[in-house]
Amino acid sequence: MKKGVLLNADVSAVVSRLGHTDQIVICDAGLPIPAATQRIDLALTQGVPTFLQVLGVVTQEMQVESAILAEEIVKQNPQLHRALLAQLTELGQHQGNTISVSYISHSAFKAQTEHSRAVIRSGECSPYANVILCAGVTF
């Protein structure tokens, strides 16, 4: 049995294959996922697992350089936005870097998911609970 925190074989495989600047998406239950992009569906029911739970586990094994959010999250889901920024700040401190965060429209966000290595779907059912994580390097 794998000893690390991340036990899901599909998620672990995607993270292990990431190169510098490759992207993965962690999303809520409603984000449309492009047919050509690998879909890893972790959603069991509404709210299980949460977006932040999935983000927390994935980022324990992924070196993150930057993150992309839909600009709508700021007004439409401010509580989750604050929690997400806090989690990214804490991750950056743990990694020894500053994770840059950029914002694009939700339409542009959906288009950008086509360029991701995978989309990991959570059971989150709150608006704009989505992030594109851009891989960094550990050296």
UniProtKB/Swiss-Prot annotation:
InterPro entries: D-ribose_pyranase, RbsD-like_sf, RbsD_FucU. It catalyses: beta-D-ribopyranose = beta-D-ribofuranose. GO terms for biological process: D-ribose catabolic process. Disulfide bonds: none annotated. The active site is at 20 (proton donor). Keywords: Carbohydrate metabolism, Cytoplasm, Isomerase. One of its GO terms (cellular component) is cytosol. GO terms for molecular function: D-ribose pyranase activity; intramolecular lyase activity; monosaccharide binding. Pathway: Carbohydrate metabolism; D-ribose degradation; D-ribose 5-phosphate from beta-D-ribopyranose: step 1/2. Substrate binds at residues 28, 106, 128-130. Its EC number is 5.4.99.62. It is found in: Cytoplasm. It comes from the Bacteria. Belongs to the RbsD / FucU family. RbsD subfamily. Homodecamer. PANTHER family: D-RIBOSE PYRANASE. NCBIfam families: PRK11797.1. Catalyzes the interconversion of beta-pyran and beta-furan forms of D-ribose. This is D-ribose pyranase. It comes from Serratia proteamaculans (strain 568).
